[in-house]
From Swiss-Prot:
Keyword match Cytoplasm: no
Transmembrane segments: 6-26, 35-55
Membrane topology qualifier: Multi-pass membrane protein
Compartments in which it is found: Cell membrane
Pfam families: DUF1328
Family, as annotated: Belongs to the UPF0391 family.
GO cellular component, one term: plasma membrane
Keyword entries, A-Z: Cell membrane, Membrane, Transmembrane, Transmembrane helix
Name used for this protein in its record: UPF0391 membrane protein bsl5717
Natural source organism: Bradyrhizobium diazoefficiens (strain JCM 10833 / BCRC 13528 / IAM 13628 / NBRC 14792 / USDA 110)
């Protein structure tokens, strides 16, 4: 859950920085948030597949 929380924090930083006109910080924060979100999705899918196959017994 921590990775998803950090992704949301960086997303909020990106939005606030974009509204205030700091486009460099906004773009960097958006990239970090996107990366962390995809890492979270991959971990979720791996654990879901493992839960449905190996750890079922």
């Amino acid at each position: 859950m921590t990775i998803l929380k950090w992704a949301l924090i960086f997303l909020l930083v990106s939005i606030v920085a974009g509204v205030l006109g700091f486009t460099g910080i906004s773009a960097a924060s958006a990239d970090i948030a996107r990366f962390l979100f995809y890492v979270f999705v991959v971990i979720f899918l791996v654990l879901l597949i493992l839960g449905l196959t190996i750890f079922r017994a």
